[in-house]
Amino acid sequence: RTRALAFDVLDENTILAGGASGGMFRSVDAGASWLMTTKPSQEHRISCLVQDKRSGKENIWYFGTGENRGSYLSDVSIYGNGIWKSIDGGLSWDSLPITTSNTPTILDGDFDFTFSIKTDISNDSLDVVYVATRGDIYRSDDGGGTWLKQLGGPNNSYYQYTDVDITSQGIVYATISSNCTDKGIWRSVDGQNWVNVTDSLFSPIYSRVVIGINPANENQVYFLAAETTGYGQHTDVFFGGETWTSLWKYEYISGDGTGNGGQWTDLSGSIPTNQSTSFDNFNAQGSYDLVVSVHPSDSNLVIIGGTNLWRSTDGFTSPNNTSIIGGYRVGSSEGDGNWGSYPDHHPDQHVILYLPSNDSVMINGNDGGIFKTQNVFKDTVEWESLNHGYNTTQLYTVAISSNANSKLLQGGFQDNGSRLTFSDNTDATWNMPFNGDGSYAGIADNEEDFYLTIQRGVMYKMKLDTNANRLAFQRMDPASCDSNKYMWMNPMEMDANNDNVMFWAEGNKLWRNNNLNNISYNSSHQKSDFGWEMFSDTLYPPSLKISALSSSLDPPNVLYVGTQNKRIYRVDNAHVGDPSVIQLPDILTAGSSYCTDIAINPLNADEIMIVYSNYSVYSLFHSTDGGQSWNKAAGNLEQNNSGSGNGPSCRDAEIIPLGDDTLYLVGTTVGLFATSKINGINTVWEQIGSATLGSTIVEYITYRQADGLLVVGTFGNGVYQTHLSSVDDILATGDNVDNFDLMLFPNPIIDRLSVVVNIDVNSDAKVVIYDQLGRSMGDAYFQRLYSGNNTIELNFSDYSSGIYFVSFVIDNKNFVQQIIIE
């Protein structure tokens, strides 16, 4: 998903683009290839972008972070972390400290969501930057060093929308949604004194309002408003929904632009509605996808974007000269096979740009990435993808074959379907046999039959060739289930030992299918009860929803069930008959704790780890007796032992036996973490793949015991894989042991720490400092130790106050000590 996109004014072959959770990228060959320019450890959640286009300032860029709709997982939203700046043409980035809270798990700053960022090219004496944040408009006169709020007030609502844009002469327009202080449409000639120019007939109810200034006549400005309930244009949208949208054109006449000084024209009646299908009607999806753009040289060509791109050749003065030029395939309707994408394009539009040297050429950022047309004027607009190495895909799930050494990978992609590859080549194509928001999947042992699901619990059995082309299909989600009880990503689990058995959730009910192999391919899009049986035990209360399913490998036939309200259940002999669904002893955590995963040791079904994804609840619980007792295991992933504070959201986990050791992995909203020893609240998790995965969201982890294949799905940077043979492949440490004496003082410290090590033989020590989230604070420090007492002096004068961990590795034995810097 791309909201941030811009040409470099110095060279239009240089394009900068930011993924909504994938980081900042730069292309110097017009999108033929891309290089990620934010470091793996830096902010990945990029929502808007701007270049300072003034002469001599062109190397200065800014991007904003965080989006309030779109970057969310299960019960968790993903916040940004302020404004970032580049002074070398976008090759490297640094945060503007006054805008960053460094608390990505807490909505505690105005700059946690940014919708738009603009610079004033008319001002040569000041470095003026405007930012539209959650409910507020800010201005900086010194390139982001300091900021002053221009419009807005207390931010009490999550969904508070704003936008800001500026003419080449420095006239600023801003919008603020109707649930905010200073709601309305605003105009300023100096960016400091503002007048509300909202027309008296404009809807009193509106959420997001986006701005489109006419480049050929900057006195003309379009405003496209979402959720104008009861006003503007009514449209029926897919899945039985409806919405209202308004489109207005403002023209400045005189004075301060209010009253007779500004002319308003309501163009809402030309917003496309009553099309042949609900997919064709205009749909902003509650403000998620919304853009309006006026062509640079033809003011009659105006494009509005929601799920689709709609082009008008008369400025939307009538509904007769409009056409779909991107998004969904024209005429799409609900049901598999009945809908798809416009050729070589993608739904859900966010940003539109025109090539400066040839404004027939347009590029567009949407949920599918970046796309380009050579001629936006053509009756049928043709597109090409620019996603060549632009690795910003968002995965909900990953599935692998159970067969050792198989290269088959399947991924459930946000708004990019269920995709597969049969190759481990990094340049391999992932083909899509099933469109939508890809969800859970199962792969039969023959690697020909696939069980694929998308959003809202739609499931198909498909026979695919090795290019993932459909050879046959059959819909198979139970006809007797109430789909209103399904989750957005509805849990499905294929039995770990038997590819003929599958488990399925329906709210508080559990289903099983013991006859997958005999589901016939009839090319039917109708639900089917074939092979499905419902367990008679239903979970209480009726409103409860199953959120996680996990089946055991050895011993087989144990099924664990997680829910949205912390409760965990176990089913023994889950593969036959009507076994009891037994609630396990209560876990001492908040009742709202949302279980996203239950990791099972593949060689011991009694060892499990529960993952709760909410912020401000304790995230990880470990059991070695099948859930009869529980121990906290999040350790340094939590700020406080209660789970409160600035700990990340934990997403998924794996327990991996490797020889005599066991590796524990946890995917979080700030990266992948590992440990080889669970030690309650003192468990030390170390960040893994800091130079590759970095702080990207790790949403899903899967492991194949047969050959050690580990696959990680990220929500923003695609899929990663490796093979494991020992714990040392991930952690260069063994068990914590007391084979040497070590003393640290003082603790807490101010700036210096003394470490005294007593050792029997000469050896080498590696010292690494980690922050509270297990992230390395720099390069390892190596010290030669000699038999007897050794003293190591560590300087922490450049460190911020807080909790840190000092790791000492001597002869592959590890000692970790928590320190506090005051």
Q: What are these model-derived regions, one by one?
A:
Residues 737-745, 749-822:
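C-terminal outer-membrane/trafficking sorting elements
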Residues 201, 733, 785:
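Short clusters of hydrophobic/aromatic residues that line enzyme substrate/ligand-binding pockets
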Residues 67, 730, 748:
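Active-site pre-Tyr helix/loop in NAD(P)-dependent dehydrogenases
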Residues 724-739:
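Low-complexity, Pro/Thr/Ser/Gly/Ala-rich linker/spacer regions in secreted
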Residues 1-726:
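Beta-propeller blade termini and top-face loops
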